[in-house]
Regions:
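Alpha-helical scaffolding within the catalytic cores
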Residues: 37-40, 67-68, 114
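Extracellular/periplasmic catalytic domains that process cell-envelope and extracellular macromolecules
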Residues: 24, 47-48, 99-100, 112-115, ...
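Short, flexible loop segments at the rims of nucleotide/cofactor-binding pockets, characterized by
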Residues: 28-34, 57-60, 104-107
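Signature of lipid phosphatidyltransferase scaffolds
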Residues: 122, 126-169
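Conserved beta-strand termini and adjacent loop/short-helix elements that scaffold enzyme active sites
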Residues: 31-33, 83-85, 109-111
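Solvent-exposed loop/turn segments at secondary-structure junctions
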Residues: 59-63, 86-90, 112-115, 126-127, ...
Length: 169
């Protein structure tokens, strides 16, 4: 079983990230698709959620494990909420329908030309962010997914999520 605490405690910060730009006490783990299984990386983080997952998604499809993990989290009593881009619903692999069926609250960000954020804030302490789309085809792309364990970073992303929520439909 994956535990966020140990890998984050052991995580090292890439030399490409200036130390001054990292919140004190933050631990960072990174994943690069094609070379690594970023869907499994995200699923492990979601599986550790106990209270809340705030999701911002440009693309969201079934089949990668992410939607399925969010449905399971909701089933465990985790408060899962989603803000999606207006173009997210798509035929056949639509991730919105199973989430809605599970009782996940969903809003559409129709104000922005494109709601291109791809983030999750988990339990006000862990933030997933990067270019990685929550879609089945992302594994074939060159994308990145970063997991930051920091209450301060999570608070900033949660505040932005709530700002976007204020303008959704």
């Amino acid at each position: 079983m994956f535990s966020i605490a140990l890998p984050l405690a052991l995580a090292t910060i890439s030399p490409a990230v200036p130390a001054a730009s990292v919140t004190s006490g933050a631990a960072i783990a990174v994943c690069f698709s094609r070379e690594e299984d970023c869907a499994a990386f995200a699923v492990r983080a979601i599986n550790n959620a106990q209270r809340e997952v705030l999701v911002s998604a440009y693309g969201l499809t079934t089949g990668s494990g992410t939607v399925e993990a969010l449905v399971r989290a909701k089933g465990r009593g985790v408060d899962v909420r989603l803000i999606a881009d207006k173009t997210t619903p798509c035929p056949a692999t639509n991730g919105i329908e199973p989430l809605a069926a599970a009782g996940v609250q969903i809003w559409i960000d129709g104000q922005a030309r494109i709601a291109h954020a791809k983030t999750m804030v988990i339990d006000e302490a862990v933030t997933l962010m990067g270019s990685y789309n929550w879609i089945r085809g992302a594994a074939a792309n060159s994308e990145n997914l970063n997991l930051v364990s920091s209450v301060a970073v999570a608070a900033a992303y949660a505040a932005h999520w709530r700002e976007r929520l204020a303008v959704t439909v």
